[in-house]
Amino acid sequence: MSSSPGDSGGTMLHQFRVANKMSRSIYDKMFVFPSMLVEEELGAEDTVVLLDDFIGTGKQVIDAWNLSFSELVAGAGTVYLMVVVARRRGREKVQAETELVVQTAHELNDSDDLFGDDCLHFTADEKRALKKYCKRANRTEPAGFGNCGLLIVFSHRCPNDSVAALHASHSKWRGLFPRNG
């Protein structure tokens, strides 16, 4: 969830409509752009559902909520944020700092942090080798934004909470799923 145009929320809305056989124009009235929510004159009996792909640290959602979304949905009864994947700590932070009710299909925990002690998918030697590559990709955030250490990639983009080796790009490194360019 972001207040920036062209973010992943639009991609998720399109995929949701196609997956649920709601892409025909007869369903258009059920879906509005976030900027048009204020025109809906929402009341306590109204429910708003926002769609997105991912919550990592929760910072992007909280910033967007504080910047504009809290005003756009003011007066609505319940506001849900439905995401495909959420990191547990990020989801909890969003729910504590906003009025959003977060629903997720897949929740990640500490064992999903590639470099964390709870991650059993890689040996200590493998983690050291991977960390070396991630530091080459991004010295300041080798484990990704918020030090999440995730291995998450979507068809439309790789979150910056994923390890840097996946998405970072510069003159000495090109990630497998670059975020820019």
Feature names for model-found ranges:
Residues 5-47, 52, 56-63:
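Short, glycine/charge-rich flexible loops or terminal/linker lids adjacent to PRPP-binding catalytic cores
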Residues 4-9, 15, 66-181:
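PRPP-dependent phosphoribosyltransferase catalytic core
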